UniProtKB/Swiss-Prot annotation:
PANTHER family xrefs: EXPORTIN-6 (PTHR21452:SF4)
UniProt lineage: Eukaryota, Amoebozoa, Evosea, Eumycetozoa, Dictyostelia
GO MF term (any one): nuclear export signal receptor activity
Superkingdom, natural source: Eukaryota
Protein name: Exportin-6
Gene this chain is encoded by: xpo6
The species this protein was found in: Dictyostelium discoideum
Amino acid sequence: MNNNDMDQKAKELQNVLEQFYLTTDNPKRKEIDTILNNYKAQSDSYEHVQYYLVHSDNQYVIWFSLSVIEDKVNKAWNSISASSQTQTKGLLLDIYLNKTGANSNSTVKNVLPQFIISKLGQVIADIGRYEFESNPQSYLLNITSIVRNPSTSIRGINLLQCISDSFTTNKKVISQQKKTTLKKLLHQNSPIIIQVLVDCLGQLFDQNAEKKFKHANLLAFHVGSPDTNTYTASFNAESKNLTKAVFDALLSYFTWVPLSDLLVPSLFDILFKYLRLDKNSIPALECLNEIVSKNLVPKGFESFLMRIFHQVYSLLTDIVSNGGQQINQYHPEFLNKFTQFIQIFINNHLGRIETNPNFPIPDFLGLLFQYSFFQTQPESFLQCIDIWSTFLDYLINLSQENGTPPPSKYTDGLLLFQSELVKRILYIFNNNTLSELDDEDKEINENGISETQLESYIKKSIEVVAKVTELYPEKSLENLYPLFTQNVTSFFCKAEESIKQGVSMENEQQFQYLVKDVTTILHLFGRLADQFVVSFAQTFTAANFIFQKLLDMCLFSVNQYIYKFGSDWEKLQIELLCTIRSFCFWLAEYGNQVRAIVGQQPDFDSNITKLISIIVPLFERNAPESILSSAGKLLMSLATISKPLNLFTQMDMLISNIHNICAPLSPSIQSILYPAISCTILLPPSNVNLSQQWDQRRPKYSPFIKGITASFLEIPQIPNFVEGKIFCKEELIQRVLRVLKVVTAIIRTVPEVTQAKSILHDGIQDTLKVTLGLFRVYISYPIVLEAILDFFFVLFEFLKAQVGVVFTQQTISTFLDILGGDNLNQLLSSGNDTGISIIKKLIEILTFIVQQPGNSFESLLGSTIEFSMEKLYPMIANTSSVLRSPFFTLLYSILDNHWKQCQQIQINSILTSFQSIFKQNDVNLFKQNLDHFEKLNSKLKLYEKISSMEPVFGCSFISMFFDVLISDTQSVHTDDIIVTIYRFASLNFDKFFNEFFTTFLVQKNQLSNEQKQILRSNFSNAIDQPTFSTNMTQFINDFSYFSFINS
């Protein structure tokens, strides 16, 4: 074929490729992909693309040509002649070194884009895998000569990085044995490579940097200190690119080279020098971060740790000099990386340095203190706070493990840190920063809690303040006490005075930030309330003063309706209630103490009476729901945590009037307040020597619960309720939903006291049958069905013994009967979220029932399996439904608790469904079910049972797991799958090695007989788990590799 023909082919290829890449919505895209793959497979395509590389300047043609050569290199490099190999390599190297704009003197007009340059380097490195194995020294000598040549230096450095990536690849494009050999050889030669790169950095540094000044009078260290000069540099564009390329290459090696091989003084010296450069220190920091992040620390590392510490200390000294003005001279990205560096250093190595007298940790913390509070960006400040949190966790754990007080050498410094940290969350000290933080848009944090940026900032800071308090409780509380006595009390005095003078609080500017600060201080003391319990006797006077003031402030806020002054005042009132609630554990301890001291009970009772008299009026004054919710939760905590001795008596008036109070309230508030009253009646004092007062509590409870359920019990008696479609009326639907929500909340909070549960069950017994009857009536109303199922799930969970077996069986049978046919299809059709929620709740109920010990619910087993496997499973098996996870938990629970009661056909059906799902790509469900299998194997010897089920299963599960590993669809779970296979194999290693492998490999038509023989012979018959796992890893890699080269 002459050049004209080849040029025409190149143009045709260019046209096809541009259609493929430039028109992503092209309907012929799949067809074009097939054409391109067919062209790749042609025997002459390899020769053609080498012509295109020389004569075409179209980036798509060049990329395609390189991909063809890459295929040949990875799949059939040894099948072409040595001369052809040399020619191809020479062509690629020529393009790579001379036609990619490698240096500023290049005359190439059309410099190739970076993605093609990277591809070139990768293909050249892939070819190098064949050469390196036979003569690594010669190969590296050629590469280093490219590095040392000024005109090609950057390409040589890029190639060293490509070599690291290619020779240590996890891709299954080379055999496992070759991977191991390549990595071993590259590891042996890595000191040469790293030294070449270090020399490059040194040369660039000498050419472009000069000394600015040297630190004097830094701490005297006990080992040779590294260079702490500060340098300035003037790197041109070419030098910058070279420097970046070297650091990128170093990072590539640092990710896998053991730390012991990196402990080279010349490496650390040059990294430290670059660290002290004005503008080029970020890459050096990234390299140091990679080094200190390694957890496997070799002997001799401590001296290098000392050198690193000295650099951190020196750099911190620089940054915090001139009263923090110097920090503005550093690039924000550098400061971010440097903070990360300190964080990693503290996380991984604090235990090594904290007890070493050569490390002046207090002085270091002093610099870190300044560095933290000089930060100007909230995100940067919180990064520093995370470092302090790590350090405090270390001290707390050390103190707890050793049973000793925390080190006194940190006391003063940490108390000062605590004080300064508190200032950072108060507007009076930090107005500018706090005002910039978003306090409107909420985001879900790492704990699943929705909060604004401002709330997150304050909460994280308070948590660190609390850790200091945990370390030094008495001194910390003494340190923080004035915040409350001065700021909070004076604020309320000022607010009260302003109201008396008729000042309009909504527009009063002096209160704008004071309200927010007081809210924050209240939040802080609420968080610290547990420390008043820990040091109860020592801090009683201060805690009692705070509690009394909280009551006074709460009374003021209720009487003055302060929530009407604006949203900040509403938040303040909520925080007041939350802070008092935080003191419920302190109240519990207070109550326990006064019971042993004659004459002090009346004072305690007076506090409780006052608290109740303050809270109750809120429910009668149409306050915002957020405040009512907090008030209701406070009453619940009072009843369930504080458990005052005379609470039942003190709440008598509220109990008697509760229905009048609750009538105008929303169902959400009723479902908080009613359970609080329920617990007040049902929960006696915890002291066993005190009267439980059941003779008074039971008569009180009956009218209480009837007052809630009476309107609900009347519903079935309504004339023509069903026939006349009266049940469809919105008022009746809302009545059903309200009562079910309230009663469900009451059941959920029932005390773990048999007598209490009995009283509750007696009170709602007539409600149960009515509720079950309504399930059939409201079958077309998913929102009602969901409420009913939620009710029964909670009922079975908390009142299982009281409800009894007969009613439980009747209820479950009703559910399965009603939801087992067309209703199930309707609920799950078209992504009906409420319908899905209903079925999920049903699955959870069935799971709970199945998990109950004994044979009480054995009669439900058959219908549960039938519903699950014949009706529900076909609808969700091949979907991504959220029901799949709870569904398979139900199946696991059936096997776990009722294997012996299950028929063989049922077991087979369940195991087949597991096997089917294992073949799918759902990573989370795969892991869940694999864990289920491991638990079943531990308890029931599942794998032994499966292996004995021939010909139903035989080795099909092992084959399936092998196929999953080969497909790479569950690569994140590879180790767990191999463990499972080992457990199967260990039942009969002879059968596994002699029968399974033969059968498995015979079925794999994509491999040649020779390849199958290699796979089998490489898998030794060793039965210890480590060797087995290694063999499995090699088998899966090589199977995939053979499939790849055969494709």
